[in-house]
Regions:
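Electropositive polyanion-binding surfaces
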Residues: 2-38, 45-461, 470-477, 486-487
């Protein structure tokens, strides 16, 4: 599922260095990294191995450099895992999805492999990242950069006219991306009537896959970006940028691939699935109260996936609810198996079996899943070193996810405190969305923030709350109920 993104934008009046303009937040983010012991520089032996393998990679012989792949990523990204090419095929479609072949550079048991198993995944803060692999690989030799020949696992998928896959193959090949786009580029091109069929077909296939997701009861979470800026007085402002439809279309290609990978693994009875249970009843109740607090109507019979699809991304209150919906997607984990099929195979939000195989530059488990699937397609045994690693991956990935989530939460807390620090003493209208032994959680709508409140005792109640603390260094926001409590 999607992660929260925080974008620190430049001061409109100064156009200076964002790191200088946002010094208070940068210091808070540095403190988060130190407190959580976020990995820093790579050890010398890892950098030495990375330098050595760049010119000695185990490259595939198959050549698909004439296929017009393109990449779609956030602006400025250099760790490009995925490139796609979509074509018409009869009444359906042919989707080729190239995934960076990290295994061509990473020797099993080597220094890079050992360090990657310690890190688990790339960790993102608003002002920087702690990468899974050294930049010589992750942002250069293994990255699917434009006009560069790179090794990749190519997923060659035939889809029918409804967008359902009818055949899937995976093979290693050399590829070349011809275009590097961001989501805004794609959206603008499609809206003005692009002549690039790859983009018009991405919209077509993406919309068909969204319809299939809706039919099977799935739920996607297109997280809006938190945008942090400074006003003329130097106060922090917090807003949400709505995701554009192109982000959904692009995500559907990744979901298509992950679902195909899971089916492949289950048929071969070896692999590792990304699984997730249905959200707990109490989590749903709390989210319903959050929706009511933001003025969003949620009929009792409507599933949460339907609600998320129905929200208006141009409405700030709806965006705030989407941003808060991450609570519905917790509890995901990894289920390895080798011989037989596990009892739990479903990812509740996908509403189907699912596997992570599309982000090997940024997530450890994907490297192993890709090798499993390519071995299955070649009708070859999965390598022993991969089989031996599968049972170890859930613990590694769980630890790295806990760290990633803690970092995300701490950075978000710092940003929200910064946005409110000049408003301490103000009174806000709020709704109590949960009650704890230490008080409760209240939702205010402008800015859309969920925070603790002293004296909140009735879930679902409306109240007037005073902001009593907004401390960036402590990453703390706190309210207290001052009156006007009415039950719902």
């Amino acid at each position: 599922m999607s992660k929260r993104w925080i974008n620190l934008v430049k001061d409109k009046t100064e156009q200076g260095d964002p790191a200088v303009e946002h010094l208070q937040l940068s210091q808070a983010f540095d403190a988060v990294r130190a407190e959580l012991k976020v990995p820093g520089d790579f050890p010398p032996e890892v950098l030495e191995e990375a330098q050595a393998v760049v010119g000695a990679a185990a490259l595939p012989k198959r050549d698909e450099t004439t296929v017009p792949f393109l990449t779609i990523d956030p602006p400025g990204s250099k760790d490009l895992d995925q490139a796609m090419c979509i074509e018409r095929a009869g009444k359906g479609y042919r989707v080729r999805y190239a995934i960076a072949d990290v295994s061509a550079f990473v020797k099993p048991g080597g220094a890079i492999d050992a360090e990657a198993r310690k890190r688990g995944q790339t960790l993102y803060a608003p002002d920087g990242r702690s990468p899974l692999h050294p930049d010589q690989l992750g942002e250069d030799a293994a990255s699917l950069l434009p006009d560069q020949v790179r090794p990749a696992f190519v997923w060659d998928m035939q889809l029918d006219s409804d967008g359902d896959d009818t055949s899937v193959n995976v093979y290693r090949a050399m590829v070349r991306s011809t275009s590097r786009l961001d989501y805004a580029d794609v959206q603008a091109a499609v809206e003005r009537g692009t002549m690039d069929e790859r983009l018009s077909l991405l919209k077509e296939v993406g919309e068909r896959r969204i319809a299939l997701e809706e039919a099977r009861g799935g739920a996607s979470l297109p997280i809006p970006e938190q945008v942090v800026s400074l006003d003329e007085d130097g106060n922090y402002l917090l807003a949400l940028r709505p995701p554009v439809p192109a982000e959904d279309w692009n995500a559907q290609i990744s979901l298509l691939t992950g679902m195909a990978a899971a089916e492949m693994m289950l048929h071969a009875e070896v692999g590792i699935l990304r699984t997730m249970p249905e959200p707990d009843h109490n989590v749903i109740l709390r989210f319903r109260r959050q929706a009511r607090a933001l003025g969003v109507t949620w009929p009792a019979e409507m599933l949460y996936g339907e609600l998320l699809r129905s929200l208006d991304r141009t409405d700030p209150k709806h965006l705030a609810l989407i941003h808060g919906a991450t609570s519905l997607f917790r509890g995901a984990g990894y289920t390895p198996f080798d011989g037989g099929v596990p009892e739990l195979t479903l990812h509740a939000a996908v509403a189907a079996p699912y596997a992570h195989v599309t982000a090997p530059l940024r997530r450890l488990v994907d490297r192993f899943g890709l090798i499993v699937c390519e071995s299955i397609c070649r009708d070859m045994p999965v390598p022993d070193w991969v089989r031996h690693a599968l049972p170890t991956l859930p613990e590694i990935m769980t630890a790295s996810e806990h760290l990633a989530n803690a970092m995300e939460r701490a950075c978000t807390d710092a940003v929200e405190a910064a946005a409110l620090q000049h408003r301490v003493g103000e009174v806000f209208r709020a709704s109590v969305v949960d009650v704890t032994k230490n008080g409760g959680l209240v939702q205010i709508s402008d800015p859309a923030i969920l925070a603790p409140a002293d004296g909140a005792s009735s879930a679902g109640a409306e109240a007037m709350v005073e902001l009593i603390e907004a401390d960036v260094a402590k990453r703390s926001v706190r309210f207290r109920v001052v009156g006007g409590v009415t039950s719902q």
